[in-house]
């Protein structure tokens, strides 16, 4: 489960007990069936602005979320999530990174498909795995994706997401 607030605070939960020996990829953590639910709400009031659900038909949490945006919001979406697992069973997930690209109206869908394929290219992956998060991080990733393309890409000028969880340590490890 992941929760991202309107102020870009985010938290994500995963039960370490559900991670078996030798799990090396995110898709192996999830089962064969499920539902993707996305709710957009106004932070100060909590009023739901929009919500949607779709069947998790691809059996991969990342692909199912991209599929949700395509069928629910009619937006071509490319997602990439990289999870670095640690050998410590008490803290099995060392770091997690994600990128989401969405095609704007009148986007060249062939170029967008090319960007989708590049999301896990070695040059992009090396930037993500380096773990350096400064003000140039998003620009570096965007440049690695688009440096040789004739296209117009923009970074969303909003605030950077910050991991913040109000849960106590005891409830987080339970």
Which residues does each PLM region occupy?
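Generic recognition of cysteine residues
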Residues: 8, 96, 107, 151-153, ...
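Active-site environment of non-heme Fe oxygenases that use a 2-His-1-carboxylate facial triad
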Residues: 69-71, 76-133
């Amino acid at each position: 489960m992941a929760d991202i607030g309107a102020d870009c605070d985010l938290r994500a939960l995963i039960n370490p007990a559900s991670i078996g020996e030798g799990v090396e990829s995110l898709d192996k953590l999830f089962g064969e069936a499920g539902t993707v639910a996305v709710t957009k709400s106004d932070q100060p009031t909590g009023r739901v602005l929009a919500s949607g659900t779709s069947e998790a038909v691809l059996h991969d949490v990342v692909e199912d979320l991209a599929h949700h945006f395509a069928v629910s919001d009619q937006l071509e979406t490319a997602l990439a999530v990289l999870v670095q697992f640690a050998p410590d069973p008490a803290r099995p997930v060392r770091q997690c990174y994600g990128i989401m690209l969405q095609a704007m109206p009148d986007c060249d869908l062939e170029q967008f498909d090319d960007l989708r394929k590049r999301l896990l290219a070695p040059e992009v992956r090396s930037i993500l795995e380096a773990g350096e998060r400064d003000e140039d991080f998003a620009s570096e990733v965007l440049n690695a994706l688009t440096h040789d393309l004739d296209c117009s890409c923009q970074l969303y000028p909003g605030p950077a997401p910050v991991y913040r969880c109000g849960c106590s340590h005891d409830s987080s490890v339970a």
